[in-house]
Amino acid sequence: MELFDLPLIWAFIIGFGIIMYVLMDGFDLGVGILFPFAPSEESRDTMMNSVAPVWDGNETWLVLGGAGLLAAFPMVYSIFLPALYIGVFLLLAGLIFRGVAFEFRFKARTSRYLWNWAFAGGSTLAAFAQGAVVGAYIQGFETANGVYVGGALDWLTPFTVLTGLGMLAGYALLGSTWLIMKTEGRLQEWAYRITLPLLAGVLVVFGIISVWTPFVDDLVRGRWFSSLTVIWVLPVLTLLCAFQIFRSVRNRFEGMPFVATMGLFIFTYLGLIVSRWPYVVPPDYTLWDAASAYESQLFLLLGLLFVIPIVLVYTAWTYWVFRGKVRAGEGYH
């Protein structure tokens, strides 16, 4: 007899890991996206130093989410990877370029400009690939008997290009609000100045995606328009977060723009989950269809319940130790 609905528990754990990754690695990817446009080389140093203590720890959540997905829902892996080989490769290549550039830039002198572009390019590529993968998930996958039967480039459509651009804009907004909170002087003023145009861009792209999505998938269209459900609360909350970003930037608040931007991402993410629930491989397979054996999920869950609190405590401790402003000339390398 199964005492717990383990696929549901695992779905919550993996979903939590994904949103933690989006929020925590999103802002340092955003810093990388904004890197070429910084007002000075000194500002770029400060931007890197603002994320230096936390950027590699932020990626822990990607590992946690990916490993959990493989262990708990192997069918998802067996369909997603063949469908998204190129997209996932671009994502990982971007993260690798970003990581290498991060370390080498602090050591380089004559070639620093090359690592500047590698850092920005890797961040941009990783962010775009993440958005395109999300768009491919919304589109759904062509499957037969639990196997992907589509082509290698079926994921790449105008819709996924748009979701990739949306993720770029969203991460750039996270990065600019992070810089407002963590820096001061000329760099902070620059971050204030670009945040509202970035917010406008995010709202425009997200609006187009929201209008387009019901035409991409019948399930989403039916769920959105068959009745006025809780899903319509989420766009309202998202717009309230956008208004709070606008208001707090106009009033020169420092922490609230970043908090409100995280709220914008959270409510958008919840909207995606509610629109697709309970399908993990749309449009055919639910999380119960794709789940591994109950015994496997239970064994792995016991280990994960030990690991997650450690990761949470370490993450909280890191952010507490490195709280406060990062000033020009100060760094952790």
State what each model feature region is:
Residues 31-53, 70-76, 103-113, 175-194, ...:
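Juxtamembrane membrane-water interface segments of multi-pass membrane proteins
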Residues 104-254, 271:
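Long, contiguous internal "core" modules enriched in hydrophobic/ aromatic residues
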Residues 281-300:
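Short, membrane-exposed interhelical loops at transmembrane-helix boundaries
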Residues 258-266:
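Central hydrophobic cores of alpha-helical transmembrane segments
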Residues 10-21, 79-93, 120-125, 154-168, ...:
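Alpha-helical transmembrane segments
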Residues 1-14, 68-84, 138-158, 219:
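Helix-coil boundary and interhelical linker segments in multi-pass alpha-helical membrane proteins
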